[in-house]
Design a protein with these regions (language model features):
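Ligand-binding pockets and gating/stacking loops
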Residues: 1-444
């Protein structure tokens, strides 16, 4: 018979302790990394909440040579490097998942309500960006960046991050531009580095003791608890790897960037998005990271776009019930976001890399996990998970065939096929991702 242990049981290191996860036994039976000659591939995933106003966002014509919609007009100068992908979805997902869509956008999680409880699923809710970061992240100081309008991971069903590790745990986002800049570019003093090295050593000692003590505890556990403990210890190993990575980069100088155009004192959402796009550009240009996720707004976004003359919060605006005035305001917001995206893409496109541009070596995915309308019509403000607005820019040197408006019919083409395309274009040898079993047709 397995003897129960206390819920207060901890694994003790020297001078510190780490609490265990809840186990059944606790209840009575019951670098800027490489040289410029390297083939550098990058991936950026940008999420806009609540969907878009369909009638003014989608181009009317399909195929090559389409005309950008009024909302996306700022992208016209780069149309040969931008594709609109119409009709993608997560086919096995419920047609309406409320505001849990953001957490599912890059994961393809589709097993009902469990994602609302703990973000996780049997496939571990591994987001495609983190799968890529796990493969190439050792080449840069930061394996990936998670950015958002709101900091942290959020709460179940209201994610503030798009990124989930292999165990389904959300990776918290940063939302303070100055803090992002400091992390990326402000050098530590010699004293700072010495103090940080001491902290690394203490943490490593604690983790070593915890791992050692866990082995004796494991013999007392049942099968289910051993699995839970195994997942817990896997997270400890991840921390160890991160400590090793941080120590490796500790004495590597951080890159210098021209900050003359950076405006950290933003007054509204438009200015905030602009400075975040600037920081994203600098992080890619300096090869500080090659994988970025960015939420340009969270689901149930309560911001009022006052700079556009909008006097209703974004979330309420999305529940327009067919009101034409509100839908016109939505078009204004959609266009402002597209204009800011275009500025980011132009900057990548105007920056040389090898025989082309940074944009040709960078795939930028922009879209939403929610369709605000019905099909391709405006509707009355829904939370549909079908026919998701999706745009892919760049990646011409990574095998992406750009300059198209592609339409996928019948709500059967998985968004995860696009994720397979992203992974393979980033150099991963994988032929599936969740329900994505092949590259997305038409892009290569």
């Amino acid at each position: 018979m397995i003897k129960p242990i206390s819920r207060r049981t901890v694994l003790r290191g020297t001078g510190a302790a780490i609490a265990l996860p809840m186990l059944e036994i606790m209840t009575p039976r019951l670098r800027a990394g490489e040289s410029s000659s390297d083939k550098v591939a990058r991936m950026v995933c940008i999420y806009t909440p609540h969907g878009v106003r369909n009638s003014t966002w989608y181009p009317e014509k399909t195929g090559f040579g389409y005309t950008m919609s009024s909302t996306l007009d700022a992208l016209s100068p780069m149309q040969d490097k931008v594709s609109i992908l119409t009709g993608l979805c997560h086919p096995r997902m419920a047609s309406n998942v409320g505001h849990a869509a953001a957490g599912r956008w890059l994961t393809g999680v589709n097993d009902g309500d469990r994602v609302l409880v703990d973000f996780a699923s049997p496939n571990k809710a591994f987001s495609v960006d983190q799968l890529v970061a796990n493969s190439i992240g050792t080449k840069t100081r930061w394996p990936s960046l998670q950015l958002s309008t709101e900091a942290g991971a959020g709460v179940p069903g209201r994610s503030r991050t798009l990124s989930f590790n292999a165990r389904g745990l959300p990776l918290p986002s940063m939302n303070e531009p100055r803090a992002v800049f400091n992390r990326l570019f402000v050098p530590e003093t010699a004293n700072d580095r010495a103090a940080e090295r001491v902290r690394y050593q203490r943490r490593q000692s604690l983790l070593d003791n915890v791992m050692s003590e866990s082995k004796s505890l494991e013999r007392r556990l049942g099968r289910a608890d051993r699995e839970r403990l195994g997942e817990f210890l896997a997270s400890i190993r991840e921390v160890e790897l991160q400590l090793d990575r941080n120590q490796k980069w500790l004495d590597q100088p951080k890159p210098e960037v021209d900050t003359s155009d950076l405006q950290f004192a933003f007054k509204n959402r438009s200015e905030f998005l602009k400075v975040m796009y600037d920081l994203m550009f600098f992080s890619l240009q300096t090869d500080s990271t090659r994988v970025i996720t960015f939420m340009s707004g969270v689901e149930v976004d309560m911001y009022k776009w006052g700079e556009l003359g909008v006097n209703k919060d974004y979330h309420s605006l999305q529940h327009h019930n067919g009101n034409k005035v509100d839908m016109e305001k939505l078009s204004k917001v959609d266009k402002r976001e597209a204009d800011l995206l275009a500025g980011f893409l132009v900057r990548l496109n105007e920056t040389a890399q090898e025989d082309s541009s940074m944009l040709d070596h960078t795939m930028v995915l922009y879209g939403s996990g929610m369709n605000n309308g019905v099909g391709f019509e405006d509707g009355k403000g829904s939370h549909s998970t079908r026919k998701l607005p999706t745009l892919l820019a760049g990646g011409g040197k990574l095998g992406i065939k750009q300059g198209q408006h592609l339409v996928y019919e019948n709500d059967r083409t998985p968004l995860c096929n696009l994720h397979v395309t992203l992974m393979q274009s980033m150099g991963l040898e994988r032929d599936h991702f969740v329900d994505g079993k092949e590259r997305l047709t038409g892009l290569s």
